[in-house]
Amino acid sequence: MQGRLSAWLVKHGLIHRSLGFDYQGIETLQIKPEDWHSIAVIFYVYGYNYLRSQCAYDVAPGGLLASVYHLTRIEDGVDQPEEVCIKVFASRRNPRIPSVFWVWKSVDFQERESYDMLGISYDNHPRLKRILMPESWIGWPLRKDYIAPNFYEIQDAH
């Protein structure tokens, strides 16, 4: 099922895939990594000037990694915001997605956390480095194929 925003993107020749609606009726769209930055700028200009949250997850062991963005547009009243959920999938072998830091500054720590936990590299992010784990940490703790080090290795890391 195609929503209003998806229809608008089709009308303007912007490539995406509609993933339907979530349980709250928020439209969910899939954008290719190579198209994400330009479409993010278009969303911002169209009025989606608030990035409510960004997160990432491991879709399946050995599968894709996903970066998820929740955008909000408030036009007429604060009590009726328009929201959209964007999913950008990246290959596990070389997970690279353009950073949208220069569009929404609030994504700074969120993209860093996604990098730290899942190893997704956000191209052109000004400070992409670990934010929760020590710089010397090996691996990406929230990947489904991550093998946790034993207690002594964790103790030595502190």
Curated annotation (Swiss-Prot):
Catalysed transformations (reactions): a plastoquinone + NADH + (n+1) H(+)(in) = a plastoquinol + NAD(+) + n H(+)(out); a plastoquinone + NADPH + (n+1) H(+)(in) = a plastoquinol + NADP(+) + n H(+)(out)
EC number: 7.1.1.-
Keyword Endoplasmic reticulum: no
Gene Ontology CC: one annotated term: chloroplast thylakoid membrane
A family per Pfam: Complex1_30kDa
A GO term, aspect molecular function: quinone binding
InterPro entries tied to this protein: NADH_DH_suC, NADH_quin_OxRdtase_su_C/D-like, NADH_UbQ_OxRdtase_30kDa_su, NADH_UbQ_OxRdtase_CS
Keyword Calcium in record: no
Compartmental location: Plastid, Chloroplast thylakoid membrane
Membrane topology per record: Peripheral membrane protein
Gene Ontology biological process terms in this record: photosynthesis, light reaction
Domain of life: Eukaryota
Keywords: Chloroplast, Membrane, NAD, NADP, Plastid, Plastoquinone, Quinone, Thylakoid, Translocase, Transport
PANTHER family: NADH DEHYDROGENASE [UBIQUINONE] IRON-SULFUR PROTEIN 3, MITOCHONDRIAL, NADH DEHYDROGENASE UBIQUINONE IRON-SULFUR PROTEIN 3
Subunit-level organization: NDH is composed of at least 16 different subunits, 5 of which are encoded in the nucleus.
Listed NCBIfam families: PRK12494.1
Function: NDH shuttles electrons from NAD(P)H:plastoquinone, via FMN and iron-sulfur (Fe-S) centers, to quinones in the photosynthetic chain and possibly in a chloroplast respiratory chain. The immediate electron acceptor for the enzyme in this species is believed to be plastoquinone. Couples the redox reaction to proton translocation, and thus conserves the redox energy in a proton gradient.
Family: Belongs to the complex I 30 kDa subunit family.
Protein name (database record): NAD(P)H-quinone oxidoreductase subunit J, chloroplastic
